Amino acid sequence: MVKVTFNSALAQKEAKKDEPKSSEEALIAPPDAVAVDCKDPDDVVPVGQRRAWCWCMCFGLAFMLAGVILGGAYLYKYFALQPDDVYYCGLKYIKDDVILSEPSADAPAARYQTIEENIKIFEEDAVEFISVPVPEFADSDPANIVHDFNKKLTAYLDLNLDKCYVIPLNTSIVMPPRNLLELLINIKAGTYLPQSYLIHEHMVITDRIENVDHLGFFIYRLCHDKETYKLQRRETIRGIQKREASNCFTIRHFENKFAVETLICS
């Protein structure tokens, strides 16, 4: 009988030679295998959520841009917009009700009174802004006045009452901005002697205006947060004007070659 034996060392050596092949086979994935990325489910953002976040980002940027544009326009209107010319001047007028065809140099000086105003002209916007300070002797109220030729409106802010009054622009009394500017230049240069007469106009308060937004930027700026009322004009005459004693106040001003006394009654 023949006994067959195997060398254990040789068997272990051959087993070690076969190990790299098996490891290489383990690294080669079959063609139909699917790769799986093992991540934490909490770290994965759904596609719908990412799209919603992108839309919110876009809308937020759009609103910010719109706010910057509107805010810039608002600041420009309030701070950067300057009048083309600013004048502080006065006009002498005859107080009594004597009708003169032309102002006379022989008229007694005591009959003349003076209106002083601060006038700002926004020629490009066709707007005149008149500030009447507290008169020294006359029994009239200080006021701020806006004549808006684009809106065809006039607004009076009585500074004593802190109330606004709006009426259609009377172009027969109020000079256009360019003409008024020429008049003021002539007065300043001394080529025109501002001695004139007084026109009376009578207005009656009617309805209250709840919203002044539609009255234009300049009147809105004047009358915002003020009680604002409509005015109705009565017949404007030169000379004596019958007045009602109760609930009336006057504003004396000029935006022409003559002075105007505006009587406003409730």
Curated annotation (Swiss-Prot):
Glycans are attached at N170. Residues 137-231 form the BRICHOS domain. The chain crosses the membrane at residues 55-75. The keyword Transmembrane applies. The record marks R243, E244 as: Cleavage. GO terms for biological process: negative regulation of amyloid precursor protein biosynthetic process. It comes from the Eukaryota. InterPro entries: BRICHOS_dom, ITM2. Residues 102-134 are annotated as: Necessary for interaction with APP and inhibitor effects on APP processing. Disulfide bonds join C164-C223, C248-C265. Residues 1-54 are cytoplasmic. Keywords: Cell membrane, Disulfide bond, Endosome, Glycoprotein, Golgi apparatus, Membrane, Secreted, Signal-anchor, Transmembrane, Transmembrane helix. One of its GO terms (cellular component) is extracellular space. Residues 76-266 are lumenal. GO terms for molecular function: amyloid-beta binding; ATP binding. The ectodomain C-terminal part of the imBRI2 is processed by furin producing a secreted Bri23 peptide and a mature BRI2, membrane form (mBRI2). The remaining part of the ectodomain of mBRI2 containing the BRICHOS domain is cleaved by ADAM10 and is secreted (BRI2C, soluble form). The membrane-bound N-terminal fragment (BRI2C, membrane form) is further proteolytically processed by SPPL2A and SPPL2B through regulated intramembrane proteolysis producing a secreted C-peptide and a BRI2 intracellular domain (BRI2 ICD) released in the cytosol. Glycosylation at Asn-170 is important for cell surface localization, but doesn't affect furin- and ADAM10-induced proteolytic processing. Plays a regulatory role in the processing of the amyloid-beta A4 precursor protein (APP) and acts as an inhibitor of the amyloid-beta peptide aggregation and fibrils deposition. Plays a role in the induction of neurite outgrowth. Functions as a protease inhibitor by blocking access of secretases to APP cleavage sites. Homodimer; disulfide-linked. Interacts with SPPL2A and SPPL2B. Interacts with APP. Mature BRI2 (mBRI2) interacts with the APP amyloid-beta A4 protein; the interaction occurs at the cell surface and in the endocytic compartments and enable alpha- and beta-secretase-induced APP cleavage inhibition. Mature BRI2 (mBRI2) interacts with the APP C99; the interaction occurs in the endocytic compartments and enable gamma-secretase-induced C99 cleavage inhibition. May form heterodimers with Bri23 peptide and APP amyloid-beta protein 40. Belongs to the ITM2 family. This is Integral membrane protein 2B. The gene is Itm2b.
